[in-house]
Swiss-Prot record:
Gene Ontology biological-process annotations: behavioral fear response; equilibrioception; locomotor rhythm
Tissue: Expressed in both the suprachiasmatic nucleus and dorsal medial hypothalamus.
Ranges where the record places region Disordered: 999-1032, 1086-1106, 1187-1207, 1242-1286
Record flagged with keyword Cytoplasm: no
Protein name: Ankyrin-repeat and fibronectin type III domain-containing 1
C-alpha cells in the first residue's frame, strides 16, 4: 500500500510539471463537478485517472466546490453556466455575496484574494471532509477520511489529498474560463468569469476590467426600467408595430400562436409601453392587425380598454362613430364599453361639436403661427403639430358625420324562446338585418306576464356580446311569460321584437307526472357506504393484529444474504403464455419505453384460465382506484389455500403494485376496453395514460412511436404475431380510442340509437369510433331541456292520437319540435345505414328523457323488439357503415360515466372492487372456520359484506339507465313507444329528390301499360314452365334471410313492368356469367344506336365532354346497399342495382344477382337485355315526367320536390332478332349510354324519355314520336360510352 501511494505521488508530480498541463491539453479532458465531487475521463494511455468513480475532494478556500446539495453539475455546454443572478456557494466569500455572469440587484462582482497553500493547510486541519469510497478492485487511490488516521501512512495520504485538491482547483478555473470565452464568442456578451473563486492564475488587471464591464452592464439594464423619455412613446411603439405588420404578413400569425410564456416575456421586454395610447393609435389608424395583436398579447385590464382618454373617448367610441365594423366587433367581444360620459344623444352630439371646434381652432392658430414665422427650428416643430391637429380635425369630422348619418337599429332577427328548465327561459337571437350605419353595442331582453308588456316583470341589459343568448332565471314554474328583445346603438334603442313563440312556461318533462330525478343523492349514499367499509376493514385489521401479537410467537428474521443476489422483478421482455399487464404512457408522438426499448409489461399469472371476463371486469373497477392499491393489498390476507379467483385477484394487485413501483407513479391511466389475445395463449391487459409533459422516469425513457414500431417489426415474425406485436400494430387505434373516450358532447338534446349484440359471455353496445362513450346519435337542438308540453305531446302521439290532430301551424310551439324530431330521425337512419321502409317498426323511447349530465339529454330510438339485441349466429338485418364499434356493456358504462358522472363512477368502482374482494375473503374464511365461534364470526362478516353488496346494487340500478331502456325495448306486448311512422312517412322515401346514401336505389319508370298483371301473366306463359324453386317466383327477393316472406309485395300494387323470372335467369346466364366483379371503364365517344341508324351516328356537339363530366357523377350503376335488408313495408318500391356477382344458391333465379341488388325498372318485360346495357338520363329538378299514353307524351309530368333531381335509369328495348346475341355467353362487352339534356329543355316542354329502338309488334313502351323527334336531332349527342367488361 505504501508503495502504491508513493507511485501515485510521483505520477501526480510528473503530471503537474508536464508540458501538457502548461500548454492546455487538459481543456479537452471532460470532467464534471457536482457538489464536491470530481469525475475524470481517460484522455490517452498515459493518463491514470479513469472516469469510473466519483471522488470527494476537500474544500478549498475560494474554490468552486460547494458542500450544498442543491448545487448543480457543470457541463461543457453553456447551458450549465449559472443563471442570472446566481450566487456562488464558496465558503470563503462569506463577507459579501458575489454574483456570477449576470446582472445583480445589488453590487457587481468584487475582487477576491486567492488563498495560499498555508491557509489551505490550516483549513484542512479544521475540517476534514470525507473523501473515501471503497474501491472494487486493486490499485484504487484512498483519499483521506474525515476522522484522523492512526496508521503510519496518514501524513502521506494528507499530502496526496492536498496536492490533488489544488490540482483539481486549477483545472476547474481553467475549464470555467474557457467556457466563458466560448459563450462570449457565441452570444456576443461581455467577457466575465464564471466563478468568484480566486486562484494564483487570476490576475488583478483582468478582474478590474471585468468588474467595470459588469457594472456597465448592470447600469445599462437599470436604465431600461427608467421613466419614459418622451410622451410620444406609445405612438412610436405603434409605429414600430405597424411597420412590423406591414413588413411581414405573418407577423400577427406568429405572435398569435406564441405560448403564454413567450407572451409574458414579450410583455416584460416591451419598454415604455403605454397600452391605452397604443390602442387608441391603432383604432384611429383603423389598423385591424395591430388591434388584434395588442388584444392577444395584453389583457383588457392592461390596455385600459374602458378608460376614456383626455378627449373623453374610449377605443370603442372611435370605432363605432367611424363605422369601423370589424374593429368594433372585436372590441365588443373582448369586453369593451362605450364612454360613460355619453348619457344621451344630446350629450354625445355636444361633445363631438366641442371636439371638432377645438380641433378647428387649434388648426387655425397653428396655421397662422407657421405663416408668420420663418424657417426656424420652432417653426418646424409647429408644422409637425399642425399636421397632427389637421389629421385629428379630419378624424373628429368623420366621427361627427358618422354619428349624424346613423339611425337606431332595426329589430333583432330570429328571436327564439326556449324553455331551459322548470324555473328559467332562454332567449336566442341574431343581429338585426340592418344596423343603420352604426354597430349594435348592447341588447335588452324584457319579459312580462301580460301580452302588452304592462307591467314588466323584469329586463336584462346585455353588454357582453360574445354570445347572443340570454337565460332568464328565477321564474315561476308553470307561469306563462311573454318575452321581447331590442337592440341599441349610439343613436338609441330600436323597436322590440317579440320571440317565437310569443310566450312560454318554465317546465320540465318530469313535471308531467311529478317524477323524481334519476340522479339524486346516489353519490352521497356511496360515500357513506365507503366510510362504513373502511371502518369495518380497520376494525378487523386491528383484531387480527392483536391476535398475532398475543398468541403468535416471534417470527425469525432471515439473516441470509441470498436476497441480495436475486434479481428483483423487472419488466417482461418476451411473452410466454400468461396473463400480463402493459402500460402505455404517451405524450403526443412519444411513448414511454423501458431501457431495453420495450413497452412496460409485468406478468400477472403464468397459469391463467382461458376466460378472464370476470377478472377483467374487476380489474376495470380497480383502474379507478390506483392510489388505493397498497391499502387494498394490506387488507387482503395471503393464503395458499385460497380459491383460484381470489388468487388471481391477489396476483393482479401484486402486479399492479410492482408496475407502480417500477414506474414511480400511482396513476397508470385508463383501461383499454378489451384484453389483447394471441394464439400462443397470451393475454395482455392494457392501460393508457396521456401525460402533460415528458417526465423523466427512473426505469424508462421516451421514444417515438413510429421508431418503436419499426424496431419491433424487424424483430417479430409475421406468421404468428404475439399479443405484444398486435399491441404495437394497433397502437394508433388504441391511443385514438383513449383520446376520444375522454371527450364529451356539447350541451343539447340528442337522439340516440340503442342497438346491442350478445355473445357467449357478454353483451356489446353499438357506438361510434369518434365518441365511444355515448350511443350513436345525432343532435336535435341546442336546448337540452324538454318542456312539459313537449313531453305531453310525445305521450299523446305514442297513444292512439294521430298526426292529423296535431296543429301544423307555424306559430304552434309543437310544430318546431316535430320538425326537429323528424329531421333527427331521418339523419340517424342515414347514419346507421337503415332505409326508412326497413325502419317502420322503430319507435321512440317514451319512458323517460335520459339526462346524461353536463347539460346533455337523450331521446332513444329503439329497433323492433326482435332486433334490439342480436343473438350469436343471428344475421344482422342491416349493416352500418364503417366507423362503428361494438363495446362491451360494462366497459361502455365505465367510459360513459367517467365522462358524464365522474364522482359517482369513482365511488362506485372503489366500493364495488373492495366489497367483491371482501366477499371472496369471507367465503374463504367461512370455508376455513373450524370451531363454532370461528364459524359464527365468519358468517357475521360475510353477511355484512352481502348487505353492502345489496345496497351498492340498488344504487347502481338507479343510475344504470341502459338496462331499463333495454328491458323496455325487448318487451313485445303491448307494443310501446312512439312509432316513427308517425314522424316520417316511409312510403315517401321513393319520391325524395336526392338519393340517400343508405338506400342507393334507382328510380323507376312508370309503365304505359294499363295492366301490369296482364303483362306478367303473358310473360309467365311465354316462358318455360318452371316451379317457384326454379325461379318463377312472383316477387323477386335477393335471399330468404334478407326479407320475410310475409313482407313480399304483390306486383299489382306497384306501377312497374317486371321481367319474368325466366328472362332474369337468361340474362344472368348470358350477360352476368362468371364471378369476376364488373368494372366500368370510360370508352370512346359514340352515338346512340337504333336499328335503322348508322352505327357512327351524328357528330358530337361542342359541349359533349362537359355534359358528360357534369352528369356522370349522378348515375348509380352499382348497388352499394348494405348486406342485409329488413322487412319491406307495403307500398314501397325497393329498386334494384344494375351490376352484381353471380351467387349460387338453391333458387335458380338468384344465380345472377346478389342481395345488394334491387328492383330493375325496364321498358318492357319481354325483351331480354343485359343489366349493364341501357341509356341513362339525368332527371331534372323541375317539373318533368312521363305521359300515360302517346297523346300525353309532351304534357308536363308530376312535380318532384327536393333539392336536386334523381337519376333515372331505363334500359333500351331491343328487337326480337337481337335477343339471341344476348344469350351468347362469349359476348365480353356491354355498353352503357349516357344521354345528356339538350340546352333547350329549360325553355320547352320536356321531352325526357327516349327509346333506343322501336319495339316490334307495336309494343313500344314509349311513344314513337319521341324517338323520331330525338333521333335526327343533331344537338343531342350521346355524351360518352362506358364499357363494362363482364
Amino acid at each position: 500500500m505504501l508503495c502504491l501511494e508513493k507511485l501515485v505521488a510521483v505520477l501526480l508530480k510528473t503530471q503537474r510539471t508536464s508540458d501538457a498541463y502548461k500548454k492546455g491539453p487538459w481543456k479537452s479532458q471532460r470532467y464534471t463537478v457536482s457538489g464536491s465531487r470530481v469525475a475524470y475521463k481517460r484522455l490517452n494511455c498515459d493518463d491514470i485517472w479513469a472516469r469510473k468513480k466519483s471522488r470527494r475532494i476537500p474544500m478549498v478556500p475560494g474554490g468552486t466546490y460547494s458542500p450544498m446539495p442543491e448545487s448543480q453539475p457543470l457541463e461543457d455546454s453553456p447551458k450549465a453556466l449559472p443563471v442570472l443572478g446566481e450566487q456562488s456557494n464558496s465558503d470563503n466569500d462569506i463577507n459579501e455575496p458575489v454574483f456570477i455572469w449576470g446582472i445583480s440587484d445589488k453590487a457587481a462582482q468584487r475582487k477576491s484574494i486567492s488563498a495560499g497553500e498555508g491557509s489551505f493547510r490550516l483549513q484542512q486541519e479544521k475540517q476534514q471532509p470525507l473523501v473515501h469510497r471503497p474501491g472494487r478492485g486493486k490499485g484504487r487511490l484512498r483519499l483521506p477520511h474525515r476522522l484522523p488516521f492512526k496508521d503510519r501512512h496518514f501524513t502521506c495520504s494528507k499530502i496526496i489529498g492536498r496536492r490533488f485538491a489544488c490540482f483539481a482547483q486549477r483545472l476547474s478555473y481553467r475549464r470555467k474560463q474557457s467556457q466563458c470565452d466560448l459563450l462570449n464568442e457565441s452570444t456576443g456578451h461581455l467577457p466575465a468569469t464564471c466563478s468568484s473563486a480566486a486562484s494564483k492564475s487570476l490576475s488583478w488587471n483582468y478582474c478590474s476590467k471585468m468588474t467595470q464591464q459588469m457594472q456597465n452592464l448592470h447600469l445599462s439594464q437599470s436604465k431600461k426600467h427608467s421613466a419614459p423619455s418622451s410622451p410620444n412613446a406609445a405612438k412610436r411603439l405603434y409605429r414600430n408595430l405597424s411597420e412590423k405588420l406591414k413588413g411581414s404578413h405573418s407577423s400577427f400569425d406568429e405572435a398569435y400562436f406564441r405560448t403564454r410564456t413567450d407572451r409574458l416575456s414579450l410583455r416584460k421586454t416591451s419598454v415604455n409601453f403605454q397600452g391605452n395610447e397604443a390602442m387608441f393609435e391603432a383604432v384611429e389608424q383603423q389598423d385591424l392587425d395591430a388591434v388584434q395583436l395588442l388584444l392577444y398579447q395584453y389583457t383588457p385590464e392592461e390596455l385600459d380598454l374602458n378608460t376614456p382618454n383626455s378627449e373623453g373617448l374610449t377605443p370603442l367610441d372611435i370605432a363605432i362613430m367611424t363605422n369601423n365594423v370589424p374593429i368594433a366587433r372585436i372590441l365588443l367581444r373582448t369586453g369593451a364599453r362605450e364612454s360613460p360620459h355619453f348619457v344621451s344623444l344630446e350629450s354625445r352630439a355636444m361633445h363631438l361639436n366641442t371636439l371638432v371646434q377645438e380641433a378647428q381652432d387649434r388648426v387655425s392658430e397653428l396655421s397662422a403661427q407657421v405663416e408668420n414665422e420663418g424657417f426656424t427650428l420652432d417653426n418646424t416643430e409647429k408644422e409637425k403639430q399642425l399636421k397632427a391637429w389637421e389629421w385629428r380635425y379630419r378624424l373628429y369630422r368623420r366621427m361627427k358625420t358618422g354619428f349624424e348619418h346613423a339611425r337606431a337599429p332595426e329589430v333583432p332577427a330570429n328571436a327564439c324562446l326556449m324553455v331551459s328548465s322548470s324555473t328559467s327561459l332562454t332567449v336566442s337571437f341574431q343581429e338585426p338585418l340592418s344596423v343603420n350605419a352604426a354597430v349594435v353595442t348592447r341588447y335588452k331582453v324584457e319579459w312580462s306576464m301580460s301580452k302588452d308588456f304592462s307591467p314588466l316583470a323584469g329586463e336584462i341589459i346585455m353588454d357582453n356580446l360574445q354570445t347572443l343568448r340570454c337565460t332568464i332565471t328565477g321564474l315561476t314554474t308553470g307561469q306563462q311569460y311573454f318575452v321581447q328583445v331590442s337592440a341599441y346603438n349610439m343613436k338609441g334603442w330600436g323597436p322590440a321584437q317579440t320571440t317565437t313563440p310569443v310566450c312560454a312556461s318554465p317546465s320540465n318533462w318530469k313535471d308531467y307526472d311529478d317524477r323524481e330525478p334519476r340522479h339524486k343523492g346516489q353519490s352521497e349514499v356511496l360515500e357513506s357506504l365507503l366510510q362504513q367499509v373502511r371502518a369495518l376493514h380497520q376494525h378487523y385489521s386491528c383484531r387480527e393484529s392483536s391476535k398475532l401479537q398475543t398468541t403468535g410467537r416471534k417470527q425469525s428474521v432471515s439473516r441470509s444474504l441470498k436476497h441480495l443476489f436475486h434479481s428483483s422483478n423487472k419488466f417482461v421482455k418476451t411473452l410466454k403464455r400468461g396473463l400480463y399487464i402493459a402500460t402505455i404512457f404517451y405524450y403526443k408522438d412519444n411513448m414511454l419505453v423501458t431501457n431495453e426499448d420495450q413497452i412496460p409489461i409485468v406478468e400477472i399469472d403464468d397459469s391463467h384460465t382461458s376466460s378472464i371476463t370476470q377478472d377483467f371486469l374487476w380489474f376495470m373497477k380497480l383502474s379507478c382506484m390506483w392510489e388505493d392499491i397498497r391499502w387494498l393489498r394490506q387488507s387482503v390476507p395471503i393464503s395458499m389455500s385460497s380459491s383460484t379467483v381470489l388468487q388471481t385477484r391477489q396476483k393482479m394487485l401484486a402486479a399492479t403494485a410492482q408496475l407502480q413501483n417500477l414506474l414511480g407513479t400511482h396513476n397508470l391511466g385508463r383501461l383499454y376496453y378489451e384484453p389483447i389475445k394471441d394464439r400462443h395463449g397470451n393475454i395482455l391487459i392494457v392501460t393508457i395514460r396521456e401525460v402533460e409533459m415528458l417526465y423523466s422516469f427512473f426505469n424508462g425513457k421516451w421514444m417515438q412511436i413510429s421508431k418503436l414500431q419499426s424496431q419491433r417489426k424487424s424483430l417479430s415474425t409475421p406468421e404468428e404475431p404475439t399479443a405484444l406485436d398486435i399491441l404495437l400494430i394497433t397502437i394508433q387505434d388504441i391511443l385514438s380510442y383513449h383520446k376520444r373516450s375522454h371527450q364529451r358532447l356539447s350541451p343539447g338534446l340528442y337522439l340516440g340509437y340503442l342497438k346491442l349484440c350478445s355473445s357467449v359471455d357478454q353483451i356489446k353496445v353499438l357506438v361510434t369510433q369518434k365518441l365511444p362513450n355515448i350511443l350513436c346519435h345525432v343532435k336535435i337542438r341546442e336546448n337540452h331541456n324538454i318542456s312539459k308540453e313537449e313531453w305531453e305531446w310525445i305521450q299523446k302521439l305514442s297513444g292512439s292520437e294521430s298526426m292529423e290532430s296535431v296543429d301544423h301551424n307555424a306559430d304552434c310551439p309543437m310544430q318546431l319540435f316535430f320538425y326537429e324530431l323528424q329531421m333527427a330521425v331521418a339523419a340517424l337512419l342515414k347514419q346507421i345505414n337503415i332505409p326508412r321502409h326497413q325502419a317502420r317498426n322503430f319507435r321512440l323511447y317514451t319512458q323517460e328523457v335520459l339526462e346524461i349530465g353536463h347539460n346533455v339529454s337523450f331521446l332513444l330510438l329503439l329497433p323492433a323488439s326482435d332486433d334490439v339485441c342480436t343473438a350469436p349466429g343471428q344475421n344482422n338485418p342491416y349493416t352500418p357503415h364503417s366507423g362503428f364499434l361494438n363495446l362491451p356493456l360494462q366497459m361502455f358504462e365505465l367510459v360513459h360515466f367517467c365522462s358524464y358522472r365522474e364522482k359517482f363512477i369513482s365511488l362506485y368502482c372503489r366500493l364495488s372492487a373492495v366489497v367483491e374482494l371482501d366477499s371472496l375473503n369471507t367465503q374463504q374464511s367461512l370455508r376455513e372456520a373450524i370451531s363454532d365461534s370461528e364459524v359464527a364470526a365468519a358468517k357475521q362478516r360475510h353477511q355484512q359484506v352481502l348487505d353492502f353488496i345489496q345496497q351498492i346494487d340498488e344504487v347502481w340500478r338507479e343510475m344504470r339507465w341502459i338496462m331499463d331502456a333495454l328491458q323496455y325495448a325487448r318487451y313485445k306486448q303491448p307494443v310501446s313507444g312512439l312509432p316513427i311512422t308517425k314522424l316520417i312517412d316511409s312510403s315517401s322515401e321513393q319520391n325524395l329528390k336526392k338519393i340517400s346514401s343508405t338506400s342507393s336505389h334507382i328510380d323507376c319508370l312508370p309503365s304505359t301499360s294499363p295492366s301490369p298483371e296482364m303483362h306478367r301473366r303473358k310473360a309467365v306463359s311465354e316462358s318455360q314452365p318452371c316451379s317457384d324453386e326454379e325461379g318463377c317466383s312472383e316477387v323477386f327477393l335477393p335471399t330468404d334471410s334478407d326479407y320475410d316472406s310475409s313482407d313480399a309485395l304483390s306486383p299489382r300494387d306497384l306501377d312497374l313492368v317486371y321481367l319474368s323470372s325466366h328472362d332474369i335467369a337468361q340474362q344472368a346466364l348470358s350477360g352476368l356469367s362468371g364471378s369476376a366483379p364488373d368494372v366500368l371503364q370510360v370508352h370512346d365517344m359514340k352515338a346512340s344506336m337504333g336499328p335503322g341508324q348508322d352505327p357512327q351516328g351524328p357528330g358530337q356537339g361542342p359541349d359533349t365532354d362537359h355534359s358528360c363530366v357534369e352528369f356522370l357523377h349522378s348515375l348509380t350503376l352499382t348497388g352499394l346497399a348494405p348486406k342485409n335488408h329488413a322487412k319491406m313495408v307495403a307500398g314501397t318500391r325497393p329498386p334494384l342495382g344494375f351490376l352484381g356477382k353471380r351467387k349460387p344458391g338453391k333458387h335458380q333465379h338468384y344465380g345472377g344477382f346478389s342481395r345488394h341488388h334491387r328492383w330493375l325498372r325496364m321498358h318492357s318485360e319481354t325483351q331480354s337485355l343485359s343489366l349493364s346495357e341501357g341509356v341513362y338520363t339525368q332527371h331534372l329538378s323541375q317539373a318533368c315526367g312521363l305521359a300515360e299514353d302517346p297523346g300525353e307524351a309532351e304534357g308536363p309530368g308530376p312535380v318532384v320536390d327536393g333539392p336536386r333531381g334523381l337519376p333515372l335509369a331505363h334500359a333500351a328495348s331491343l328487337p326480337e332478332e337481337r335477343r339471341s346475341c344476348l344469350q351468347d355467353p362469349r359476348r365480353p362487352l356491354q355498353r352503357v349510354y349516357v344521354e345528356p339534356y339538350s340546352d333547350t329543355l329549360a325553355g320547352q316542354d320536356p321531352k325526357l324519355w327516349t327509346s333506343l329502338s322501336p319495339t316490334p309488334a307495336g309494343r313500344s313502351s314509349l311513344p314513337s314520336s319521341t324517338s323520331s323527334e330525338m333521333s335526327p336531332d343533331p344537338t343531342s349527342p350521346v355524351s360518352e360510352i362506358l364499357s363494362s367488361m363482364l
